[in-house]
Amino acid sequence: MDLSGILTSTVDGRTKGMPPESGTLALADIGRQGWSIFSGDLPLPLAVIRKSVLGENSRWMRAFLEKTGARIAPHGKTTMAPQLFKLQLEDGAVAITVATTQQMRVCRDFGVGSILLANQLVGRAEIGYVVGELKRDPEFSFL
């Protein structure tokens, strides 16, 4: 997966978890805002991920998948975080699950090669997008 451009991606107050008055910010600039969950600077509910806990979860999941041979396709649609998609795939997930072709586009833009659509593929534009991706990338796996 190619995450090289993610820090220059922008978000604004319409993005889940961002203060409505925040304006447009590059992801790389969010940490410099001085926002605090405990001061009420960010709209709730929101998810908080501790790096140490994420690392332990990652190690555990990798070991579990290796030991059991289980095949999983975690829900990317919940976080829509390509950084987590990358980690999950590195840990042994066989695909990332999405609910819409818009979510699939995000995955594909960052190089996810195997996607499970947990929905019916309907609509001319949606079908056209998937067919186009399958033609463009013979390695792409659409489940």
Predicted regions and their residues:
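A short alpha-helix capping/helix-coil boundary motif
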Residues: 37-42, 62-66, 80-85, 109
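Alpha/beta catalytic barrel-like cores
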Residues: 1-42
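A broad, structural surface signal
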Residues: 56-59, 63, 86, 90
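Membrane-targeting and insertion segments and their boundary/processing signals
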Residues: 27-35, 58, 62, 77-78
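Short, functional N-terminal and low-complexity linear motifs
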Residues: 22-30, 49-54, 70-74, 96-98, ...
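Active-site-proximal beta-alpha core segment in soluble small-molecule metabolic enzymes
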Residues: 73-143
